[in-house]
Swiss-Prot record:
Gene (UniProt): Senp5
Protein name: Sentrin-specific protease 5
Naturally occurring in which organism (per UniProt): Mus musculus
Family recorded in the similarity comment: Belongs to the peptidase C48 family.
Active site per the UniProt annotation: 640, 657, 707
Subcellular location: Nucleus, Nucleolus
Amino acid sequence: MKKQKKILWKKGIHLAFSEKWNAGFGSFKKFYFPQNLCFLKAKLGRPVAWHRQVKHFQCNKGLHIQKTWIQDVPFCSKTKSGLATQNVSTLYPKVKRKDSKHFISSSRSLLKLQADKLLSSAKSLDHKYCREKSLLKAAPGLSANTVLGRANGHEPTTDPQASDFPMKFSGESQSPGDSGKTVVLNKHRKRVCHGCYQGLEHHRNRRPLIPKQFQLNQHRRVRASLMMYEKLSMIRFRYRIFRSQHFRTKSRVCKLRKAQRSWVQKVTGDHQENLRDNNTEGDNCNPVPSLEPKDPCRCQPYFPDMDSSAVGKGKNCHVPDGHTKENPVLDKEHGLDDTFPDQQNGCVAYNWDQSSSCPKWECTEQIHEIPLMEHPSSDKFSPETERALMALGQESGTSAVSDDREKLPVSGADKSVSSVDGPVSEEPAQNENFQMEEDGSLKQSILSSKLLDHPYCKSPLDAPLLCSEPKVENQMSGGKSSQTASPVDDEQLSTCLSGFLDEVMKKYGSLVPLSEKDVLGRLKDVFNEDFSNRKPFINREITNYRARHQKCNFRIFYNKHMLDMDDLATLDGQNWLNDQVINMYGELIMDAVPDKVHFFNSFFHRQLVTKGYNGVKRWTKKVDLFKKSLLLIPIHLEVHWSLITVTLSSRIISFYDSQGIHFKFCVENIRKYLLTEAREKNRPEFLQGWQTAVTKCIPQQKNDSDCGVFVLQYCKCLALEQPFQFSQEDMPRVRKRIYKELCECRLLD
């Protein structure tokens, strides 16, 4: 391995000192090969792969020798070109004859001879040209005759053109019979450029070894050129940027923009041309004042650089039928004042009419950014507009008009408008509303009715009125708040609330039955003032009080019933009512109308089902049921409450359920009980004629927790003979009322 490396190293040195390479450097004077340079086989045309270290060494050695020993050789020098071709002709047959991938090195004596020849030739070189200039001359495409060459300070010379160079690149078409070609591989930044040299062939006519002009690779858009000196890199970089697609597109767009005129320039230019034509046809001067202001102090109409309806060849110019774009004269029927009304959607119409014998030029200008602050109405001009029109009218009145000019038909409205030596009157602005109807389709395409309703199209004088309304409301609200400022401070209100809540806790054991109406009513009675605007403070005080008094020992005793706080807590929120609450409330109902109603205990039906009549026989020992008019029997089926009523006068057994459920066996059990009770009490009239009914048109619950509350409300309404005027939304209020009634041991109306 070491021996092979040594052989390759020697061959590299020999190749670097060979006269063929020196002739190449001396003749080209622009090429040096910093990376891979190898020969192709004549038949295969493939580059020879060198070892990496050998390539690096060969590159460095070649550069060093070329910089130190070889001096610049002018192009087309007969002695040097002959020497180069002679050396090439002596070396080329060896390469072609060997037909191997290794380079053929010369002997040590040949190497010395070639070195002596190079030294002698170097001494006789002409030092007139420096290396940089000679490189720029020989660079393909960057000769002294080009623009870039002149920019770098080079004068045009009579050197051979790049088109005479016998060099081909991989981009050119090559015949399959070409042989003896050298390929230059440029792998800088992973870009491979193949250049096939035909100058290394056996030159019988001793022509100089000159490369061809380079070409651009159209597919990759990368210029395939030989490596040049570092001083040419900046020129090549600038040239590449100059030829880039983005730069060319940008420059093309700039040229197009410069070539195109704005619509304002076109309009003014077209009018000036038309006026010049009219002047040549007429006798004296232009009847229409020029658009270019002669006096800087004189007001002239302003043409904004935006889409408008000005006459001319603008971008959005509308020309009526029967007139060409070059004709600035518009008749009455197709004039622009007929198409657009005055000041509609921010448009201001300027009318110049000198006399009945002169043509009339009417121009409408659309102003989007300048609102008319002085006159919000649509039939008046602004003062600045009137001054401009007055100046233009006076200027037009002084101009002479010939009699040979064509006269246009003018309507009565236009005749009243036209004046020779005065300003334009305000009448055409008012009459244009009637002339709009002639060309309504064109108007609707530009001026939409929806735009007129837009807030930006309204008069700016209306804005203060809109802005003043919230201020008035704020003042009124501020005055109301100042009037309702309560003289009662928070401390007094808190003290009063605390005393009232103490009374509620003492009477009801909790704040469950307390409602907002009760609190506000009590405060109004104390302070003779409405505290509805201070509800947040009141609610905060109640919450703090409830946190300090969470639970107390509160009990209710009524007859044989006793309720504690756990029983009363079932009435809070959406809790299920228990038997103690149902039974005690039924006792209150029964005591409210003792002669008519009898309320059975909630355990009655369960005892009847489990033990029969004998289990409940003693429950009615002191009561004659058949002397009552209504019997109320609550049915508790584990998780649901229902009600069975018995109307003794009509012998009807009814079933009430807040969910629409009908338990037939419950009704049958009650019917059997009544028959047995009639026999025991010796009441034969009640042994027959019993009927059962299911009541459906009654208030229904919409949750799963208020069935007990509905049953108690059914009982109360039936006992007091009141209609069912309640619903699910009334259940929170009904719960509070039941709580109060239980605590007070009486029914509240």
